[in-house]
């Protein structure tokens, strides 16, 4: 499989835990696919961010969405503002349209268009991040058609570079220094922006590097038992812990493993 689109996800926070017996094999399968899929270039996994903003959910609570091997997609309106249902979080890579999306309908009586909203009842509208993720999967297919030699990490980086940043959102600048002599714009709603098919394909056509699971480099820092209490969150001010990595790396992902004992998770 070159591209795996996943318009689904776990509902309860922390329920899809890759360290648990139930989901350990799922992560092993993802790792196998990024290491061996497409003859070692890696399968591209695309996941919906989810439609649970109202309940306070966050993609950081779900290992399928926050894994470095996956591309997590949020949903925006046609007016380029975030959809009210789209689950936020720092693990979102990009976004695509999540309402008013025209697609083929189910056949027969299972169809969603029985009242004839369209002259041809084979089509209907659908919405949600289940609609936005397949658009990104389709764009990834166009990227691979333009350049079959892209590694799965190249695909992620190209989407990072090529997504557009509408002025309908507020943006933060990350610490990168390899994009227009500065950092990337990012926010927790749209990721690095709204996916741009033309820009992504054009970038893929001229892309020279090949970043795969086999040339990925890691650096790690370990902190001992902090023996600290977590205060109630007031004005979004929490605890601040810092560590330093001395290796000279281009950082693509940061993974934090933490063991917290608390009466309430989430």
Sequence positions of predicted segments:
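Alpha-helical scaffold segments in soluble metabolic enzymes
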Residues: 93, 138, 199
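Short Gly/Pro-enriched turn/cap motifs at secondary-structure boundaries
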Residues: 82-86, 91, 184, 189-190, ...
């Amino acid at each position: 499989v070159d591209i795996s689109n996943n318009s689904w996800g776990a509902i309860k926070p922390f329920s899809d835990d890759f360290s648990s017996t139930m989901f350990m094999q799922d992560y092993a399968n993802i790792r196998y696919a990024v290491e061996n899929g497409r003859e070692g270039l890696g399968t591209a996994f695309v996941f919906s961010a989810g439609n649970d903003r109202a309940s306070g959910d966050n993609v950081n609570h779900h290992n399928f969405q926050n894994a470095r091997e996956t591309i997590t997609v949020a949903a925006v309106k046609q007016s380029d503002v975030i959809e009210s249902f789209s689950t936020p979080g720092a693990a979102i890579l990009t976004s695509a349209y999540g309402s008013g999306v025209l697609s083929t309908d189910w056949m027969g009586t299972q169809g969603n268009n029985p009242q004839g909203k369209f002259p041809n009842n084979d089509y209907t509208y659908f919405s949600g991040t289940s609609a936005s993720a397949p658009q990104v999967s389709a764009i990834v297919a166009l990227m691979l058609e333009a350049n079959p030699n892209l590694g799965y990490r190249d695909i992620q980086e190209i989407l990072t570079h090529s997504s557009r940043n509408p002025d309908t959102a507020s943006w933060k600048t990350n610490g990168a220094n390899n994009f227009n002599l500065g950092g990337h714009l990012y926010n927790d709603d749209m990721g690095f922006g709204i996916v741009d098919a033309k820009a992504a394909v054009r970038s893929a056509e001229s892309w020279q590097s090949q970043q795969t699971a086999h040339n990925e480099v890691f650096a790690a820092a370990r902190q001992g038992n902090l023996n600290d209490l977590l205060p109630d969150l007031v004005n979004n001010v929490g605890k601040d812990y810092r560590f330093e990595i001395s290796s000279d790396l281009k950082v693509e992902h940061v993974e934090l493993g933490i063991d917290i004992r608390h009466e309430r998770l989430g």
